[in-house]
């Protein structure tokens, strides 16, 4: 009888272990736009223990606004941005609890953008936050907190195979290798190329008094108290921080300030002193003001690094051989940052000159018309590039041009739906262009993935041969004299950050 019981226990234990592993494979790796939560969380666990001077927690505002790498570059301070999409305050608390098992930061920054939100996050967002965590008592408590607030079940978190069983037909090599060599080095941060300026009406309302009398929710305040207690227990100072966001108001600021005053917590609101770090709503945001792009990120990061240097006196570890991986990763970051320049150019003439650099392969595809609004100086640049006269003088027609290393290697135009498909270097390019009466479209695929903005005018997709990825996708509406730019956001979360 005893042997049967032991055999039964062993069977179910083995079954659970196998099912858990299969379940892990079935968990979606999530798209880059969702924030790569698995890669970034696994990277946290891969860090050498007790090497972080500071930790940054919160939702997407935290990891898009601050990168530990420019902080390291300028100050030799180590930090990690440990957050995930739409993270609620109760989940952030358990992230802090998890972090203190592996790191001993002296300061903990909590990004307050979603701290006051009482409504639970959606199912997908909760999964992105909880699935990547190692199984532990902390994770179990976090799951119980979330399932207690939603219709999600405990079993579906403990055995994700129950939730994702339909993914069998979708599995790829990445599902079996996630968490191995992820090629990610951003220390928790993500960078976005490209600028989408904030709207004028939103700028007018930014940090204004809406007349609301806001009070921080009592149920969320309980988690603030738990965070304070947790940080004190682990010898860390808790600091509230609010990174730039165009929808933040004076009333929201006052709500957090009142809470900070009540708890005796330092509160840094970047929305109250934009001139001190040079915030520019034209160039520093990737999505019209909700999140920072790489330009805004560097400004916010540098200010935070200076703050830590001034108030905490952290040792500059840039010459310390124990931190060689930081040096190597910071060099990679700097290279990518410098190459981001193209994604912030708003002028057509400057853009046409930029894409002629040796490192780029660029594809031009016209939708509807790209001729009627061309200025004379732009026409001269196009002629010097070797662009067909028909693009310059042919209204409502289609055009496809391939530029590699500054040279036109192929082009076609005409009053018909145009299609071009060839391999250029190591990438496969498929392009389609249709004038007003011939499809009215512009499509560019790089290795099968669509990148074109598909807007009226001249659509340009730029591939960087050194970084081995698309770094920008824009359209200039040259069908009228304004030449207005539209940019399709490129989130470079994949292999770089």
Language-model-derived ranges and their functions:
Residues 1-14:
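N-terminal Sec-pathway targeting helices
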Residues 86-90, 215-218, 244-252, 371:
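Acidic-and-aromatic substrate-binding clefts and catalytic sites of carbohydrate-active enzymes
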Residues 126-234, 317-337:
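Secreted/periplasmic serine-hydrolase-like ester/acetyl group-modifying domain
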Residues 225-249:
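Active-site segments of SGNH/GDSL-like serine hydrolases
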Residues 254-323:
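C-terminal regions of proteins
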Residues 338-361, 365-497:
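Short acidic-hydrophobic catalytic motif
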């Amino acid at each position: 009888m005893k042997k049967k019981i032991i055999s039964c226990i062993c069977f179910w234990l083995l079954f659970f272990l196998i099912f858990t592993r299969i379940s892990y494979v079935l968990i979606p790796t999530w798209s880059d736009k969702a924030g790569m939560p698995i890669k970034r969380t696994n990277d946290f666990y891969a860090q050498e223990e007790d090497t972080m001077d500071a930790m940054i927690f919160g939702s997407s505002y935290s990891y898009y606004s601050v990168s530990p790498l420019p902080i390291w570059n300028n100050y030799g301070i180590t930090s990690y941005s440990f957050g995930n999409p739409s993270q609620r305050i109760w989940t952030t608390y358990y992230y802090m609890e998890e972090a203190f098992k592996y790191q001993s930061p002296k300061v903990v920054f909590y990004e307050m953008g979603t701290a006051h939100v009482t409504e639970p996050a959606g199912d997908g967002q909760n999964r992105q936050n909880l699935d990547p965590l190692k199984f532990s008592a902390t994770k179990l408590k976090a799951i119980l907190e979330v399932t207690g607030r939603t219709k999600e079940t405990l079993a579906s978190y403990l055995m994700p195979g129950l939730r994702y069983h339909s993914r069998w037909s979708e599995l790829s090599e990445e599902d079996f290798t996630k968490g191995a060599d992820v090629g990610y080095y951003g220390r928790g941060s993500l960078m976005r190329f490209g600028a989408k300026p904030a709207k004028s009406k939103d700028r007018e309302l930014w940090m204004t008094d809406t007349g609301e009398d806001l009070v921080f929710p009592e149920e969320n305040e309980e988690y603030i108290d738990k965070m304070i207690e947790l940080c004190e227990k682990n010898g860390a100072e808790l600091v509230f921080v609010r990174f730039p966001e165009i929808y933040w108001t004076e009333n929201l600021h006052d709500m957090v300030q009142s809470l900070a005053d009540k708890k005796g917590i330092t509160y840094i609101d970047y929305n109250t002193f934009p001139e001190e770090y040079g915030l520019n709503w034209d160039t520093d945001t990737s999505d019209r003001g909700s999140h920072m792009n790489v330009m805004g990120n560097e400004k916010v990061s540098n200010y935070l690094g200076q703050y830590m240097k001034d108030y905490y006196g952290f040792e500059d570890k840039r010459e310390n051989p124990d931190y060689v991986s930081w040096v190597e990763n910071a060099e990679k970051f700097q290279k990518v940052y410098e190459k981001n320049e193209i994604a912030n150019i708003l002028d057509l003439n400057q853009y046409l000159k930029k894409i002629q650099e040796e490192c780029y392969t660029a594809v031009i595809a016209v939708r509807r018309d790209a001729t009627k609004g061309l200025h004379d100086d732009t026409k001269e640049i196009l002629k010097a590039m070797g662009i067909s006269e028909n693009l310059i003088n042919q209204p409502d027609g289609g055009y496809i041009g391939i530029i590699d290393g500054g040279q036109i290697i192929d082009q076609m135009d005409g009053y018909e739906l145009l299609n071009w498909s060839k391999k250029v270097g190591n990438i496969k390019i498929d392009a389609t262009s249709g004038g007003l009466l011939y499809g009215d479209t512009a499509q560019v695929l790089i290795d099968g993935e669509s990148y074109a903005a598909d807007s009226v005018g001249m659509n340009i997709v730029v591939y960087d041969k050194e970084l081995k990825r698309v770094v920008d996708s824009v359209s200039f509406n040259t069908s009228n004299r304004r030449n207005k730019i539209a940019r399709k956001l490129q989130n470079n979360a994949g292999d770089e950050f």
